[in-house]
Amino acid sequence: MTLPMIMSCGMYYSVPGLRDLCHDVKSRNDDAFTDAAEWLSRVIDKYDLEGYSVIPIPNHSGRAEYTLDILKRLRRLRSIRICDILVGAAHATQYDAKKAGTRLSLNDYGFELRGDIPFNRAILFDNVIGSGNTYFSAMKTISFKTSLLTLAQTHPTAYYANQWSKFE
């Protein structure tokens, strides 16, 4: 079974409660991690993830923090392999860059792999996909196309597929 480009709980602005959940996750609300894992478990139940490693994408600190916390909660609910091997450079948040009238480039993340991906089968995980830059930068770092598991997306999947074609 081929996985879709994006596996999400829904659209950020239109699914009731999803935007608030994403904000609570970024605030490191412990209950939000559990709720996020429950939402994500319903998404991954639709797919066969056997043999895949789920890689948490680091936040602006350069480390996977809340993304890793959510995946650990998800692993309590579903059998998933977590591979915390992606690190990055500390950088501005997308939100702060947007407020400043700029946009982060793919190079601003400074992602590096610190280990091997078992079977070269990976799924990236991030809280929200907005512009797609974080996802695309992480995908370029691992050197092969991969799906993204995310709580929410701000655009339809076709938008991201079109954006990705510009980087190939």
What are these regions (language model features)?
Residues 1-52, 87-119, 131, 154-157, ...:
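Active-site-facing substrate-recognition patch
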Residues 27, 58-63:
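Short histidine/acidic/glycine/proline-rich micro-motifs that form metal-
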Residues 52, 80-82, 122, 145-147:
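Hydrophobic anchor at the start of a short beta-strand
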Residues 64-82:
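Substrate-recognition/cap helix-loop segment adjacent to the acidic, metal-dependent catalytic center
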Residues 96, 136-140, 144-168:
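A short, conserved beta-to-alpha structural element at the edge of catalytic cores
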Residues 120-128:
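Conserved Lys-Pro-Asp/Glu-containing loop-to-beta segment of HAD-superfamily phosphomonoesterases
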Residues 128-138:
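Acidic, divalent-metal-coordinating active-site segment for phosphoryl/phosphodiester hydrolysis
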